[in-house]
Amino acid sequence: MAIIKLRGVLVDILVEMAPDFYKSYATTDKKGVKQLLVQCQNALYGTMVASLLYYRKFTKSLTEIGFDLNPYDPCVANKMIEGKQMTICFHVDDCKLSHRTPKVMDKMIKWLRQEYESIFKDGSGEMTVSRGKVHTYLGMTLDYTVRGQVKITMIGYVDEILTAFDKADPKGRGTKTSAAPENLFKIDEDCEKLPPNKAVEFHNLVAKTLSATKRATPDTYTAIAFLTTRERTPQKDDWTKLVHLMKYLRGTRTLPLILSANGSGILKWWVDASFA
Protein backbone atom coordinates (compact mmCIF):
# COMPACT_ATOMS: atom_id res chain seq x y z
CA MET A 1 0.00 0.00 0.00
CA ALA A 2 1.30 3.47 -0.85
CA ILE A 3 0.13 7.05 -0.27
CA ILE A 4 0.74 9.45 -3.16
CA LYS A 5 0.39 13.22 -2.84
CA LEU A 6 -0.42 15.11 -6.03
CA ARG A 7 -0.02 18.89 -6.04
CA GLY A 8 -0.63 21.96 -8.17
CA VAL A 9 -1.43 21.75 -11.87
CA LEU A 10 -1.73 17.96 -11.85
CA VAL A 11 -4.66 18.22 -9.43
CA ASP A 12 -6.37 20.73 -11.74
CA ILE A 13 -5.93 18.35 -14.67
CA LEU A 14 -7.45 15.40 -12.81
CA VAL A 15 -10.40 17.46 -11.56
CA GLU A 16 -11.02 18.76 -15.07
CA MET A 17 -10.88 15.25 -16.55
CA ALA A 18 -13.19 13.63 -13.98
CA PRO A 19 -14.81 16.29 -11.73
CA ASP A 20 -17.42 13.94 -10.28
CA PHE A 21 -14.69 11.60 -9.09
CA TYR A 22 -11.87 13.91 -7.95
CA LYS A 23 -13.39 17.31 -7.09
CA SER A 24 -14.67 16.38 -3.63
CA TYR A 25 -11.25 14.98 -2.64
CA ALA A 26 -9.16 17.95 -3.77
CA THR A 27 -8.02 20.19 -0.89
CA THR A 28 -5.46 22.95 -0.30
CA ASP A 29 -2.48 23.01 2.02
CA LYS A 30 -1.49 25.82 4.41
CA LYS A 31 0.12 27.75 1.55
CA GLY A 32 -3.00 27.54 -0.59
CA VAL A 33 -1.58 24.98 -3.02
CA LYS A 34 -4.08 22.43 -4.29
CA GLN A 35 -3.38 18.85 -3.29
CA LEU A 36 -4.89 15.41 -3.66
CA LEU A 37 -4.01 12.41 -1.52
CA VAL A 38 -4.41 8.99 -3.14
CA GLN A 39 -4.09 5.62 -1.44
CA CYS A 40 -2.90 2.87 -3.80
CA GLN A 41 -3.30 -0.81 -3.05
CA ASN A 42 -0.37 -1.53 -5.38
CA ALA A 43 2.54 0.54 -6.65
CA LEU A 44 1.39 2.83 -9.45
CA TYR A 45 3.64 2.52 -12.50
CA GLY A 46 5.22 5.73 -13.75
CA THR A 47 5.60 7.51 -10.41
CA MET A 48 8.72 8.10 -8.34
CA VAL A 49 7.18 6.09 -5.50
CA ALA A 50 6.54 3.14 -7.81
CA SER A 51 10.13 3.15 -9.06
CA LEU A 52 11.48 3.27 -5.51
CA LEU A 53 9.19 0.47 -4.29
CA TYR A 54 10.17 -1.73 -7.21
CA TYR A 55 13.87 -0.98 -6.71
CA ARG A 56 13.67 -2.01 -3.06
CA LYS A 57 11.83 -5.22 -3.93
CA PHE A 58 14.13 -6.17 -6.80
CA THR A 59 17.40 -5.46 -4.97
CA LYS A 60 16.13 -7.38 -1.94
CA SER A 61 15.35 -10.36 -4.18
CA LEU A 62 18.82 -10.23 -5.73
CA THR A 63 20.70 -9.94 -2.44
CA GLU A 64 18.69 -12.84 -1.02
CA ILE A 65 20.11 -15.13 -3.71
CA GLY A 66 23.69 -13.96 -3.22
CA PHE A 67 24.12 -10.88 -5.41
CA ASP A 68 26.11 -7.85 -4.22
CA LEU A 69 25.17 -4.34 -5.35
CA ASN A 70 27.93 -2.40 -7.06
CA PRO A 71 29.18 0.32 -4.65
CA TYR A 72 29.59 2.78 -7.53
CA ASP A 73 26.32 2.08 -9.36
CA PRO A 74 23.29 0.97 -7.30
CA CYS A 75 21.60 -0.37 -10.44
CA VAL A 76 24.29 -2.99 -11.07
CA ALA A 77 24.53 -6.29 -9.17
CA ASN A 78 27.24 -8.97 -9.33
CA LYS A 79 27.57 -12.58 -8.21
CA MET A 80 30.28 -15.18 -8.72
CA ILE A 81 28.73 -18.33 -10.21
CA GLU A 82 30.86 -21.34 -11.22
CA GLY A 83 33.98 -19.21 -10.91
CA LYS A 84 32.74 -16.52 -13.30
CA GLN A 85 31.00 -13.22 -12.58
CA MET A 86 27.37 -12.70 -13.47
CA THR A 87 26.41 -9.06 -13.87
CA ILE A 88 22.88 -7.68 -13.92
CA CYS A 89 22.34 -4.07 -15.00
CA PHE A 90 18.78 -2.87 -14.54
CA HIS A 91 16.62 0.16 -15.24
CA VAL A 92 13.39 -0.47 -13.31
CA ASP A 93 12.27 -3.79 -14.88
CA ASP A 94 14.56 -3.73 -17.94
CA CYS A 95 17.53 -5.98 -17.20
CA LYS A 96 20.76 -6.76 -19.04
CA LEU A 97 22.41 -9.99 -17.93
CA SER A 98 25.87 -11.33 -18.73
CA HIS A 99 27.77 -14.53 -17.85
CA ARG A 100 30.24 -16.78 -19.66
CA THR A 101 28.08 -19.92 -19.30
CA PRO A 102 24.75 -20.15 -21.20
CA LYS A 103 23.29 -22.64 -18.70
CA VAL A 104 23.82 -20.15 -15.88
CA MET A 105 21.95 -17.57 -17.94
CA ASP A 106 19.13 -20.09 -18.48
CA LYS A 107 18.74 -20.56 -14.72
CA MET A 108 18.72 -16.82 -14.05
CA ILE A 109 16.12 -16.17 -16.73
CA LYS A 110 13.97 -18.96 -15.28
CA TRP A 111 14.26 -17.39 -11.81
CA LEU A 112 13.25 -13.97 -13.13
CA ARG A 113 10.19 -15.49 -14.82
CA GLN A 114 9.14 -17.24 -11.62
CA GLU A 115 9.59 -14.15 -9.48
CA TYR A 116 8.40 -11.32 -11.72
CA GLU A 117 6.48 -12.48 -14.78
CA SER A 118 2.75 -11.69 -14.58
CA ILE A 119 0.46 -12.80 -17.41
CA PHE A 120 -2.72 -10.70 -17.57
CA LYS A 121 -6.13 -11.76 -18.84
CA ASP A 122 -5.49 -10.26 -22.26
CA GLY A 123 -2.32 -12.33 -22.61
CA SER A 124 0.08 -9.42 -22.11
CA GLY A 125 2.78 -9.24 -19.48
CA GLU A 126 5.00 -12.02 -20.78
CA MET A 127 8.69 -11.41 -20.11
CA THR A 128 10.62 -10.97 -23.35
CA VAL A 129 14.17 -12.29 -23.68
CA SER A 130 16.79 -11.32 -26.25
CA ARG A 131 20.02 -13.32 -26.50
CA GLY A 132 23.02 -12.91 -28.76
CA LYS A 133 25.55 -10.26 -29.76
CA VAL A 134 23.15 -7.41 -30.62
CA HIS A 135 20.46 -6.06 -28.29
CA THR A 136 18.03 -3.18 -28.10
CA TYR A 137 18.05 -1.78 -24.56
CA LEU A 138 16.50 1.48 -23.32
CA GLY A 139 16.40 2.86 -26.85
CA MET A 140 20.03 1.94 -27.53
CA THR A 141 21.35 -0.69 -29.90
CA LEU A 142 24.19 -2.50 -28.11
CA ASP A 143 26.42 -4.36 -30.55
CA TYR A 144 28.95 -6.79 -29.05
CA THR A 145 29.89 -8.37 -32.39
CA VAL A 146 33.55 -7.32 -32.08
CA ARG A 147 35.22 -9.08 -29.17
CA GLY A 148 36.23 -6.75 -26.33
CA GLN A 149 34.12 -3.78 -27.35
CA VAL A 150 30.55 -2.55 -27.52
CA LYS A 151 29.17 -0.28 -30.22
CA ILE A 152 26.28 1.93 -29.10
CA THR A 153 23.87 3.65 -31.47
CA MET A 154 20.40 5.19 -31.25
CA ILE A 155 19.68 5.63 -34.96
CA GLY A 156 15.92 5.10 -34.70
CA TYR A 157 15.63 7.54 -31.80
CA VAL A 158 17.75 10.17 -33.56
CA ASP A 159 15.54 9.78 -36.63
CA GLU A 160 12.51 10.53 -34.43
CA ILE A 161 14.22 13.72 -33.23
CA LEU A 162 15.02 14.79 -36.78
CA THR A 163 11.47 14.05 -37.95
CA ALA A 164 10.08 16.25 -35.15
CA PHE A 165 12.61 18.96 -36.01
CA ASP A 166 11.76 18.88 -39.73
CA LYS A 167 8.10 19.48 -38.85
CA ALA A 168 9.05 22.37 -36.57
CA ASP A 169 11.51 23.92 -39.04
CA PRO A 170 11.08 22.64 -42.63
CA LYS A 171 13.86 24.97 -43.79
CA GLY A 172 16.44 23.52 -41.39
CA ARG A 173 17.82 20.95 -43.81
CA GLY A 174 21.48 20.24 -44.45
CA THR A 175 24.31 19.05 -42.19
CA LYS A 176 27.07 20.49 -40.01
CA THR A 177 30.51 19.14 -39.11
CA SER A 178 30.39 20.47 -35.54
CA ALA A 179 27.75 20.07 -32.85
CA ALA A 180 27.86 23.72 -31.76
CA PRO A 181 28.34 27.09 -33.47
CA GLU A 182 31.23 29.36 -32.51
CA ASN A 183 28.85 31.75 -30.73
CA LEU A 184 27.27 29.01 -28.60
CA PHE A 185 27.86 30.78 -25.27
CA LYS A 186 27.10 34.30 -26.49
CA ILE A 187 23.72 35.60 -25.31
CA ASP A 188 22.07 38.68 -26.80
CA GLU A 189 19.78 39.99 -24.06
CA ASP A 190 17.92 42.12 -26.63
CA CYS A 191 17.16 39.19 -28.90
CA GLU A 192 13.47 38.47 -29.52
CA LYS A 193 11.97 35.63 -27.49
CA LEU A 194 10.41 32.63 -29.18
CA PRO A 195 6.61 32.56 -29.36
CA PRO A 196 4.95 30.09 -26.93
CA ASN A 197 4.37 27.33 -29.48
CA LYS A 198 7.96 27.56 -30.72
CA ALA A 199 9.25 27.57 -27.13
CA VAL A 200 7.43 24.27 -26.53
CA GLU A 201 9.01 22.77 -29.65
CA PHE A 202 12.41 24.03 -28.45
CA HIS A 203 11.91 22.38 -25.06
CA ASN A 204 10.78 19.06 -26.57
CA LEU A 205 13.68 18.86 -29.02
CA VAL A 206 16.27 19.74 -26.37
CA ALA A 207 14.82 17.19 -23.92
CA LYS A 208 14.79 14.44 -26.54
CA THR A 209 18.34 15.21 -27.63
CA LEU A 210 19.53 15.23 -24.01
CA SER A 211 18.40 11.61 -23.68
CA ALA A 212 20.47 10.60 -26.70
CA THR A 213 23.42 12.66 -25.46
CA LYS A 214 23.57 10.80 -22.15
CA ARG A 215 23.48 7.39 -23.82
CA ALA A 216 24.97 7.37 -27.30
CA THR A 217 26.01 10.82 -28.57
CA PRO A 218 28.42 12.35 -26.02
CA ASP A 219 29.84 14.50 -28.83
CA THR A 220 26.76 16.72 -28.39
CA TYR A 221 27.37 17.30 -24.67
CA THR A 222 28.66 20.87 -24.89
CA ALA A 223 25.86 22.09 -27.15
CA ILE A 224 23.07 20.37 -25.24
CA ALA A 225 24.49 21.46 -21.87
CA PHE A 226 24.10 25.09 -22.94
CA LEU A 227 20.71 24.68 -24.62
CA THR A 228 19.21 23.08 -21.51
CA THR A 229 19.94 26.33 -19.65
CA ARG A 230 17.87 28.25 -22.22
CA GLU A 231 14.62 26.30 -21.96
CA ARG A 232 12.85 28.67 -19.57
CA THR A 233 12.88 31.71 -21.88
CA PRO A 234 14.40 30.66 -25.22
CA GLN A 235 15.24 33.32 -27.78
CA LYS A 236 15.45 33.20 -31.57
CA ASP A 237 19.23 32.98 -31.26
CA ASP A 238 18.78 29.82 -29.19
CA TRP A 239 16.64 28.31 -31.93
CA THR A 240 19.40 29.07 -34.44
CA LYS A 241 21.88 27.23 -32.22
CA LEU A 242 19.46 24.31 -31.93
CA VAL A 243 19.19 24.22 -35.73
CA HIS A 244 22.99 23.93 -35.89
CA LEU A 245 22.89 20.97 -33.49
CA MET A 246 20.09 19.27 -35.44
CA LYS A 247 22.10 19.59 -38.65
CA TYR A 248 25.06 17.96 -36.91
CA LEU A 249 22.85 15.11 -35.71
CA ARG A 250 21.58 14.59 -39.25
CA GLY A 251 25.13 14.29 -40.56
CA THR A 252 26.25 11.91 -37.79
CA ARG A 253 23.07 9.88 -37.18
CA THR A 254 24.86 6.56 -37.81
CA LEU A 255 28.09 7.50 -35.99
CA PRO A 256 28.50 4.96 -33.14
CA LEU A 257 29.91 5.36 -29.66
CA ILE A 258 32.50 2.58 -29.27
CA LEU A 259 33.66 1.51 -25.81
CA SER A 260 36.41 -1.02 -25.17
CA ALA A 261 38.88 -2.05 -22.48
CA ASN A 262 42.35 -3.62 -22.64
CA GLY A 263 43.10 -4.02 -18.94
CA SER A 264 45.70 -1.23 -18.83
CA GLY A 265 43.62 0.94 -16.50
CA ILE A 266 44.38 3.97 -18.70
CA LEU A 267 41.39 5.97 -19.91
CA LYS A 268 41.71 7.13 -23.52
CA TRP A 269 39.25 9.23 -25.51
CA TRP A 270 39.41 10.01 -29.24
CA VAL A 271 37.54 13.01 -30.59
CA ASP A 272 37.41 14.90 -33.87
CA ALA A 273 38.92 18.25 -32.89
CA SER A 274 39.23 19.67 -36.39
CA PHE A 275 36.69 22.37 -35.59
CA ALA A 276 38.24 23.42 -32.26
What are these regions (language model features)?
Residues M1-A276:
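Long, low-complexity, charge-biased intrinsically disordered regions
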